[in-house]
Amino acid sequence: MMKINVYSEKSGNFASDSKKKPMIIIESKKKKLETLKKEYPDAMIIDVTSHAQDEFVKFSPFYPNGGIPVPFTEGLVAVSVEGIWQGLKVFENVDIDTSLFSKRDMKNMKRTTRKYGPIRGHRKGVRGEELLGYLTARKLIYLPCYKWVLENKLQKLVTAIRVISKNKPVVLLDYNTNPDVYNPKSPLSHASLIKAYIEGNYPE
């Protein structure tokens, strides 16, 4: 397991310049590691997927960081972002599944149209009557949930990436590389949200 130190800008480990801009690149987890090392010989390569073998696995939306407020549902929390996203889906013949809010093993969490039929939308809260379209749900459910995790559960690791990225390139690996919140054709890259958060332009 890789160990990462959180470097302080006041320490001598990295002579960090607060004016330096972070150098963060998003790449596909499907690329061979040897290829990535050739393309980015000076970079630190960090896997932020659910298959990461170190503490950066906590960045995965599937990871049970715990205590995440379920949007539009006062008093209810879930253990993972993916559990909320999948749990609030409503299909033609199947409603929400709140059991996913407490699922910790990161397995078999996706609820698909192949299994449940056409999706109608995401319910706006567990007890809500309104169904949100895909992009609206992405903005009102997924984005705030993931931001909450970054701000409340992962600040130590966020700081590590921020400081390192000001001194050398950081490559974040994700299975999805779509950074466009408004592109419905591809799942949103959570690695791109980490990058955006560190660069101060997290989508709202």
List where the protein language model places each region.
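Charged, low-complexity intrinsically disordered segments
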Residues: I4-Y7, F14-E204
